[in-house]
């Protein structure tokens, strides 16, 4: 995904966690609105949750990159959740984002290495 930005560097968004809060649309929006029973670790009236598992920064070719590993879950228990790896940088007035994901079951059956390779191989010339 490529979007215009007035930022000069990815670090202008703040920490990786602050960056994610500004682009949280990447994780999807909760479609259901209404009262729900709070169970399974979900907040009251919430049917989806996202947890940041890991963040890091790295400089490649003079550009700072953010790497984020996020586990999202929905109340329906869809595959136990999704592992979403997000790589982002800023160059030439544009925000570049690569998101790779796999369902929890597939993640632990071997998809992890492919998703990680896709996310870590992303770079902007």
Curated annotation (Swiss-Prot):
Q: Which domain of life is it from?
A: Eukaryota
Q: What keywords appear on the UniProt entry?
A: Phosphoprotein
User: Which family would the database say this protein is a member of?
Assistant: Belongs to the PsbP family.
Q: Which GO terms label this protein's molecular function in UniProt? A: calcium ion binding
Q: What is this protein called?
A: Putative oxygen-evolving enhancer protein 2-2
Q: Which Pfam families match?
A: PsbP
SUPFAM superfamilies xrefs: Mog1p/PsbP-like
Q: Which GO terms describe its cellular component?
A: chloroplast; chloroplast stroma; chloroplast thylakoid; chloroplast thylakoid lumen; chloroplast thylakoid membrane; extrinsic component of membrane; peroxisome; photosystem II oxygen evolving complex
Supply the InterPro entries for this chain: Mog1/PsbP_a/b/a-sand (IPR016123), PsbP_C (IPR002683)
Phosphoserine is found on 15
Q: Which GO terms describe its biological process?
A: photosynthesis
């Amino acid at each position: 995904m490529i979007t215009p930005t007035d930022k000069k560097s990815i670090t202008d968004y703040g920490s990786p966690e602050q960056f994610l809060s500004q682009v949280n649309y990447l994780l999807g929006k909760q479609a259901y609105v209404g009262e729900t029973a709070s169970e399974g670790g979900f907040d009251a009236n919430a049917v989806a949750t996202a947890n940041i598992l890991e963040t890091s920064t790295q400089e490649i070719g003079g550009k700072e990159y953010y790497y984020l590993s996020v586990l999202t879950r929905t109340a329906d228990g869809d595959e136990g959740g999704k592992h979403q790896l997000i790589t982002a940088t800023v160059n030439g007035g544009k925000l570049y984002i690569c998101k790779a994901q796999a369902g929890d079951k597939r993640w632990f059956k071997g998809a992890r290495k492919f998703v990680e390779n896709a996310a870590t191989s992303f770079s902007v010339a």
